[in-house]
A protein has these predicted regions:
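Short terminal alpha-helical segments
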Residues: 2-53, 112, 116
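Amphipathic alpha-helical binding modules
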Residues: 81-130
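Heptad-repeat coiled-coil alpha-helices
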Residues: 34, 41, 58, 62-65, ...
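Residue-level recognition of alpha-helical structural elements
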Residues: 10, 38-42, 75, 100-107
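Short, solvent-exposed, charged loop/turn and helix-capping segments
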Residues: 55-80
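Non-transmembrane amphipathic alpha-helical segments
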Residues: 24-28, 59, 86-89, 93
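Short intrinsically disordered terminal tails
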Residues: 1-2, 63, 67, 126-130
């Protein structure tokens, strides 16, 4: 297998991982919007899928040493708005992938960060209910 073929295979895996992240993120957003039970699980699944796609993305495009800045944490942020913002970041990451892999990676890391923040808020809220 030559380098070009290996790169093509890696890019296909990134595409599939980004699709899965999108699917799980959409499911989490739908679940949150409709007031489903245990929303923290759906958000966690989306977070894990985004984290995995971020790992594949960084390996595929040689960005392992990049450490994008962390977005400013919003006080009293609502999980639903964080998940919506992460969906927008994921969309931008997917769009920028072919144009600027570094910029796309930054948006992808923002997606992960916001999902992680939403998950943390939901976990705390769930613990308070118990």
């Amino acid at each position: 297998m030559d380098a070009a073929e290996e790169q093509r295979m890696l890019e296909e895996k990134v595409s599939k991982a980004l699709e899965e992240a999108r699917t799980k993120l959409d499911a989490a957003l739908d679940h949150l919007s409709n007031g489903g039970t245990e929303p923290e699980k759906k958000v966690w699944w989306a977070e894990e899928a985004a984290e995995y796609s971020s790992l594949l993305y960084s390996l595929t495009y040689g960005l392992e040493d990049e450490d994008p800045p962390v977005p400013v944490r919003k006080r009293n942020a609502e999980p639903t708005s964080l998940v919506k913002e992460s969906a927008e970041s994921l969309r931008r990451a997917t769009e920028l992938r072919g144009k600027s892999s570094l910029e796309g990676y930054r948006y992808l890391r923002t997606t992960v960060y916001k999902l992680r923040q939403a998950h943390h808020i939901l976990e705390k809220a769930g613990a308070k209910k118990r």
